[in-house]
Amino acid sequence: MASPVQALLLDMDGVMAEVSQSYRQAIIDTARHFGVSVTHEDIDHTKLAGNANNDWQLTHRLVVDGLNGASSAPTLEAVTAQFEALYQGVGNTLGLCELETLLTPKGLLRELHRRQPKGMAVVTGRPRKDCAKFLTTHGIEDLFPVQIWLEDCPPKPSPEPILLALKALGVEACHAAMVGDTVDDIIAGRKAGAVAYGVLTPQTYAKSILEQTPAAIGKVLEQVGASVVLTPGLGELLDLVPAVPTASKAPTVNGKSGVREANISRVTKETSISVKLSLDGTGKSKVSSGIGFLDHMLTALAKHSRFDLELDCKGDTWIDDHHTTEDCALTLGEAFDVALGDRAGIARFGSACVPLDEALSRAIVDISSRAHSEINLQLVRPSVGELSSEMITHFFESFASAALXTLHVDVLRGRNDHHRAEASFKALAVALRTAVKHDATAGVPSTKGVLA
């Protein structure tokens, strides 16, 4: 039986930091400065070969190779200087570092930190100042009292960075896990005796979905020792490193432990709606809204969220679809809010990318009790079936408003509006399923101590 994980060691770039527009762009632009064309695929290929944890050296290698080893090739020092000018910025010109974003939700990182008896460490090939700036910018420096940088020792795939982190955390290798996106990360972790978890970058993950083929890097990471390959955001770590609760308690609704369901009725001069919703179902549904395409979408939502849903609506569809669609969304959102109860013991965050043929949609949910939505479906046709395109967007907005959740839904690509819309509803369903998942160790998943 595997030893329980007591400490997490996280790489930074591609794991916590989105660097496609910063470090990677600096590689491409630096190479261009010296007359060499480098693509993201070239960078991936070089990193896949290993021994590529230092981006200055990696850039120099790509430039020299691109110039076929010519005597006029720049020195490592010259390449490093150009790289740093682009990344850090010069004078009034902002550096590419300003484009970096946090890949892993801050709330998830804090929950993972809470679960680790020995804590968490950053083990990165970044220089100290770049690592510190990113952690401070995103307000997570307190989660990583141990930080191993480029200056500390030989870089991965050497096990030395891992061993230094383990020593500082006071944990045996067999009780620690290294999380990284490159073969160097995995090899270093395994050489040090730790468990190794691979992770796909957002670009690699999106490409694998669009092409409907497994990511090649995932197979390679497994071959060099990764026990599992995670998707961007690291949400699966909640299943891999569960904490032992001191007092396990299922989510409660109005004092009834373990019951997460609601019956809501809404009657106006325009519609009469009843909704019965169970968050712990199997995806059964019985939907009759009076709008065929809306029924189709709500059936898909129930199926892929694993919610049991009964919805019946009598609305003034002889006028148009506005009142019926909006009120169905509001009633369903209210039922969702009531079924959640005090929100204790849930994961809170959920995200999903879901394809439907050529279409790819992404949904991100935060059950925050702060109603907000950003919806971009890129629909072209005036309607899909009897449901107007503007009301498809408005459905998501109304649901988020009544459910008291933050919701982002984006169509990343697609040509067929039916596919765009359906992929969006399915992405929302999968994201909701993750967000409401029972987590006995989470307590109230907010540093405020309340989600209300």
UniProtKB/Swiss-Prot annotation:
SUPFAM superfamilies: HAD-like (SSF56784), Ribosomal protein S5 domain 2-like (SSF54211). Its EC number is 4.2.1.19. CDD domains: IGPD. It comes from the Eukaryota. It holds the Pfam family IGPD. Keywords: Amino-acid biosynthesis, Histidine biosynthesis, Lyase, Multifunctional enzyme. The keyword Lipoprotein does not apply. GO terms for biological process: L-histidine biosynthetic process. It catalyses: D-erythro-1-(imidazol-4-yl)glycerol 3-phosphate = 3-(imidazol-4-yl)-2-oxopropyl phosphate + H2O. Pathway: Amino-acid biosynthesis; L-histidine biosynthesis; L-histidine from 5-phospho-alpha-D-ribose 1-diphosphate: step 6/9. Belongs to the imidazoleglycerol-phosphate dehydratase family. This is Imidazoleglycerol-phosphate dehydratase.
